[in-house]
From Swiss-Prot:
Gene3D superfamilies: 4'-phosphopantetheinyl transferase domain. The lineage of its organism: Bacteria, Bacillati, Actinomycetota, Actinomycetes, Propionibacteriales. The keyword Ribosomal protein does not apply. This is Holo-[acyl-carrier-protein] synthase. Disulfide bonds: none annotated. Transfers the 4'-phosphopantetheine moiety from coenzyme A to a Ser of acyl-carrier-protein. Its cofactor is Mg(2+). One of its GO terms (biological process) is fatty acid biosynthetic process. It is found in: Cytoplasm. Keywords: Cytoplasm, Fatty acid biosynthesis, Fatty acid metabolism, Lipid biosynthesis, Lipid metabolism, Magnesium, Metal-binding, Transferase. It catalyses: apo-[ACP] + CoA = holo-[ACP] + adenosine 3',5'-bisphosphate + H(+).
């Protein structure tokens, strides 16, 4: 059963400007492993975190580091959730978090589906 769905899009260039203009923003949004990725990948990961927040009902007190995107050997993105995000997911009865990322033509996008 579907528990929640979220989608988000990010303008890659504008996101890059925000990261460069705001000291510490990269560290607030991304884990050290995520932060090593190129800009388009960071934008897609931010879109995924925003989409996850929407799917969870925009929980108060959500910490960005509690939703980390890792890649399986195949390259498939997967969320590793913990802390505030895991608590909210458990409250909603989430058993699986599905995520799809894309970036092309200067736009990054992500879709998240929460399943019981």
């Amino acid at each position: 059963m579907i528990v929640g769905v979220g989608i988000d899009v990010v303008d890659v260039a504008r996101f890059g400007v925000s990261l460069s203009r705001t000291p510490g923003l990269t560290d607030r949004l991304f884990t050290p492993e995520e932060a090593e990725r190129p800009l388009a990948s960071l934008a897609a990961r931010f879109a995924a975190k925003e989409a996850l927040a929407k799917a969870l009902g925009a929980p108060e007190g959500m910490h960005w580091h509690d939703a980390e995107i890792r890649s399986e050997e195949s390259g498939r993105p997967v969320f590793e959730i913990r802390g505030s995000v895991l608590r909210r997911a458990n409250d909603l009865g989430v058993g699986s978090v599905h995520v799809s990322l894309s970036h092309d033509a200067g736009i990054a996008s992500a879709v998240v589906v929460l399943e019981s």
